[in-house]
Amino acid sequence: MVHFIFVTGGVVSSLGKGLTAASLAMLLQAKGFRVSVRKLDPYLNIDPGTMNPHEHGEVYVTDDGAETDLDLGHYERFTGVSACKFDSITTGAIYSKLLKDERLGNYAGVTVQVIPHVTNIIKDFILSNTKGFDFIICEIGGTVGDIEGLPFFEAIRQIGNKLKSENCLFIHLTLLPYVKTARELKIKPTQHSVKALRAIGISPNILVCRAERNISKGEIDKISLLCNIESEYVVPAIDQKNIYLVPIAYHNSGLDNKVLKFFNINIMPSKLDKWHDIINRLKDSNSKVRIAIIAKYHKLKDAYKSVIEALDHAGIYYKYKIDLVWINAENLTEENINKKLLDIDGILVPGGFGERATKGTIIAIKYARTNNIPFFGICFGMQLATIEIAQNLIGIKDAVTEEFKVDGTKIIEKINKNCEDSKITIENVKKTMRLGSYPCSLVASTIAANAYKSLEINERHRHRYKFNNEFQNIFEKHGIVFSGFSKDEEIVEIIELPLLRWFVGVQFHPEFKSKPFEAHPLFIQFIKAAIEYNKCN
């Protein structure tokens, strides 16, 4: 029988419910259990695919092409298990299905209501696709008390009532704010959060308390008394310097064993060798390398969450700290770039959409190429790299991307040529996007082939434009190597400038497949080049 664990949050948002769910999944996995982690988001968007990165953060793409919340990236990175479209749902997707079914007459003329019809869809999502798993961990987005989340809390209340405690566990994550003037952690917000949860019929079984300093036994006992939870099941979650220290911190707090004890499951030893190795590597990371991220969504670093993590994974691999330097691409000019990129060891241009900030980004790419600084362009970053090369190396001064709808020589063109600009609307925007994992063939003896140690790979994509193959010959005459292609050879996947120290652009998103214990080969090689550049300068 599968066991369900629901992770909810209170007091404030962004407490780390996703990291808690991912950490618990990893810890249970380390004991030999099969675990699936899912995210239920209360917002009305069908998925985050069309949301502004400044509003939502990164859109995490799964192998099967689902555009999901960045928390699924945490789930994958911690467990090593690929997420899929069945691991994420939103209120928007629920209402979309509900209204479609209502129009088709599937409700047989009854009055369609939040209870039971919306809650039934939520329950079906949670209770479906459970075969082969010992635990299903469901993270409920937002905080208790949010009006958008009420149907989700009602649905999991009903599930808990049906399955009873033998197969259902509620974990509630709260904040214990530290008031410096009083020199104490405040428990009152946690009391109110638990009270709000109980008011809708859910009594938390485990209370995870986030705090910036250690929680004393006296404070734990007080929380236990006031929240009516045994002190054994009040788990401290103290701030950590690095997110990869969180799972072991939870293990040291006994979270995994408490879950097993609650379910009356025999406690087995944990195999955590690879995580202890990560911790040791982090402790041994005394040297650092400076990487500039040329960002158009610089106001919210979570817009590049997987890129940041993938760089850290490569840093862990080499026992180096990655010192990220965030550069607002809109503010870059020929006049200030020397100052902005002073003492930089590597330049990375991540994915993005739209014309804004492209001028400054192209200036940064030119700076990397002409100064022989290690460069890594991802998706849009690769596309802009080809435009920079066309304009400044080959001499095609009017080189443009078709995405911006301007006159010029289209170095970057639509994947689907039959899709006119006027047809690209919110309604069919998904149909124009190449989403998910696709195979890619590599050319032997190239940077890419040497990095992957294979000629056949699979990587995840999220784009609707590609390199115009009509210009391949002229690019090759100027020293550019096309080292990766889609299986039908229609889409250029990787470009390289082998005469430079390390200059690589990829059409896909390698950051989505990087793990802390298995850094992505391209990020490994990029950081290696940056380390060597640092030593030479």
UniProtKB/Swiss-Prot annotation:
A Pfam family: CTP_synth_N
Residues annotated to bind L-glutamine: 352, 380-383, 403, 464
Pathway where this protein functions: Pyrimidine metabolism; CTP biosynthesis via de novo pathway; CTP from UDP: step 2/2
InterPro entries, sorted: Class_I_gatase-like, CTP_synthase, CTP_synthase_N, GATASE, GATase1_CTP_Synthase, P-loop_NTPase
Ranges where the record places region Amidoligase domain: 1-265
UniProt keyword list: ATP-binding, Glutamine amidotransferase, Ligase, Magnesium, Metal-binding, Nucleotide-binding, Pyrimidine biosynthesis
Record-listed E.C. numbers: 6.3.4.2
UniProt GO molecular function: ATP binding; CTP synthase activity; glutaminase activity; identical protein binding; metal ion binding
Activation and inhibition: Allosterically activated by GTP, when glutamine is the substrate; GTP has no effect on the reaction when ammonia is the substrate. The allosteric effector GTP functions by stabilizing the protein conformation that binds the tetrahedral intermediate(s) formed during glutamine hydrolysis. Inhibited by the product CTP, via allosteric rather than competitive inhibition.
Binding residues for Mg(2+): 71, 139
Cellular component, GO annotation: cytoophidium; cytoplasm
Residues where CTP binds: 13, 146-148, 222
Positions of the catalytic residues: 379 (nucleophile), 509, 511
Residues bound to UTP: 13, 222
Residues the entry annotates as binding ATP: 14-19, 71
Reaction(s) this enzyme catalyzes, per UniProt: UTP + L-glutamine + ATP + H2O = CTP + L-glutamate + ADP + phosphate + 2 H(+); L-glutamine + H2O = L-glutamate + NH4(+); UTP + NH4(+) + ATP = CTP + ADP + phosphate + 2 H(+)
Domain spans labelled Glutamine amidotransferase type-1: 290-536
GO biological process terms on file: 'de novo' CTP biosynthetic process; pyrimidine nucleobase biosynthetic process
Protein origin, superkingdom: Bacteria
PANTHER family recorded: CTP SYNTHASE (PTHR11550), CTP SYNTHASE-RELATED (PTHR11550:SF0)
Miscellaneous comment text of the record: CTPSs have evolved a hybrid strategy for distinguishing between UTP and CTP. The overlapping regions of the product feedback inhibitory and substrate sites recognize a common feature in both compounds, the triphosphate moiety. To differentiate isosteric substrate and product pyrimidine rings, an additional pocket far from the expected kinase/ligase catalytic site, specifically recognizes the cytosine and ribose portions of the product inhibitor.
Family the entry assigns: Belongs to the CTP synthase family.
Quaternary state and interactors: Homotetramer.
Role this protein plays: Catalyzes the ATP-dependent amination of UTP to CTP with either L-glutamine or ammonia as the source of nitrogen. Regulates intracellular CTP levels through interactions with the four ribonucleotide triphosphates.
Name the record gives this protein: CTP synthase
Organism: Rickettsia conorii (strain ATCC VR-613 / Malish 7)
Taxonomic lineage of the native organism: Bacteria, Pseudomonadati, Pseudomonadota, Alphaproteobacteria, Rickettsiales
Chain's gene name: pyrG
